[in-house]
């Protein structure tokens, strides 16, 4: 019975990672501005998660000090997603997701600073290898430089909010803090759109197919994927989760090629550079797991 539950959780994790990969494809298929897309995503996802908490009859009250921190993290999430979708729209899904493998490199730099731990030599070495993989991609895909830079900035901000969340997640329920973060990000983007005078009739006048894609993005790819991933992480080891989530760029790039088509076809050096980055990230996880296993 326990073996069946493990297999079910493992397959569910792959499904969640598949959904995360599909998020990038939706970003390319939804034909509205990046900030507008994030506004819809955070607003609807926040409502769905809030409804889920009400259904569970769970309190959402938090200390004011924690709320202030969550609001700041929510701003970071909004900025992260805005530049994620901006990168997709000025380049493509393949470029954007390949850059997201740089997350572990940024984490190896930022984590020692935020958590005040020593820098590990092999993380620096792997970071240099990842930069080499990135250099190969940039040499042959220089026409996508703007998208590469947007994606790298998005990854950097994403690592920042993940590390901050790493501290908050131990203090409060993960779904509750996400609701606060989503609505804070929604408010932040709302202010930006108001200042930029984007809220007009055309903003809400979208074709039915676009509304459908937005709802899929907010419900399945955001609210559901988040709550399901939290449940899965309770049953699987962090190592298994980490290795599996590294497949997100692979799933996303394959989905983009089959759904969007030739625009997602890249040169051979791009795939070589992407494989170097992905393999290094996975090797980093394997070594970390072995070192952790040797600790008393």
Q: Where do the model's predicted regions map?
A:
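Transmembrane alpha-helical segments that form core, pore/gating elements
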Residues: 17, 25-28, 49, 107-108, ...
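Hydrophobic transmembrane alpha-helices of multi-pass small-molecule transport proteins
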Residues: 49, 71, 119-138, 189, ...
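Glycine-/small-residue-enriched transmembrane alpha-helix faces in small-molecule transporters
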Residues: 1-39, 75, 79, 83, ...
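Transmembrane alpha-helices of multi-pass small-molecule transport proteins
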Residues: 32-79, 104-107, 157-164, 179-197, ...
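C-terminal-most transmembrane helix of multi-pass membrane proteins
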Residues: 42, 210, 246-296
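C-terminal transmembrane-helix exit sites in multi-pass transporters
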Residues: 53-56, 103-125, 250-271
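Helix-helix packing/entry segments at the starts of transmembrane helices
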Residues: 40, 97-102, 165-186, 222-258
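Specific transmembrane alpha-helical segments of multi-pass solute transporters/efflux pumps
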Residues: 56-94, 100, 136, 218-236
């Amino acid at each position: 019975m326990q073996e069946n539950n493990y297999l079910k959780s493992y397959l569910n994790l792959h499904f969640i990672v598949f959904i995360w990969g599909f998020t990038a494809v939706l970003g390319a298929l939804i034909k509205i501005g990046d900030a507008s897309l994030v506004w819809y995503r955070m607003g609807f996802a926040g409502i769905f998660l809030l409804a889920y908490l009400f259904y569970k009859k769970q309190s959402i009250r938090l200390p004011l000090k924690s709320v202030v921190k969550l609001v700041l993290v929510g701003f970071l999430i909004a900025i992260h997603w805005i530049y994620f979708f901006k990168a997709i729209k000025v380049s493509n899904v393949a470029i954007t997701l390949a850059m997201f493998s740089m997350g572990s490199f940024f984490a190896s730099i930022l984590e020692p600073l935020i958590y005040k731990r020593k820098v590990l030599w092999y993380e620096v070495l792997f970071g240099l290898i990842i930069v080499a993989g990135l250099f190969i991609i940039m040499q042959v895909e220089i026409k996508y430089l703007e998208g590469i830079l947007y994606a790298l900035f998005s990854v950097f901000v994403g690592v920042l909010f993940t590390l901050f969340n790493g501290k908050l997640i131990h203090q409060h329920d993960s779904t509750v803090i996400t609701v606060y973060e989503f609505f804070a990000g929604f408010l932040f983007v709302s202010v930006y759109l108001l200042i930029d005078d984007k809220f007009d009739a055309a903003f809400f006048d979208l074709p039915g197919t676009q509304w459908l894609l937005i709802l899929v993005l907010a419900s399945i790819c955001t609210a559901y994927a988040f709550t399901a991933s939290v449940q899965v992480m309770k049953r699987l080891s962090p190592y298994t989760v980490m290795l599996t989530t590294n497949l997100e760029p692979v799933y996303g790039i394959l989905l983009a090629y089959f759904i969007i088509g030739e625009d997602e076809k890249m040169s051979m050096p791009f795939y070589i550079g992407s494989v170097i980055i992905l393999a290094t990230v996975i090797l980093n996880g394997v070594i970390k797991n072995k070192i952790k296993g040797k600790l008393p």
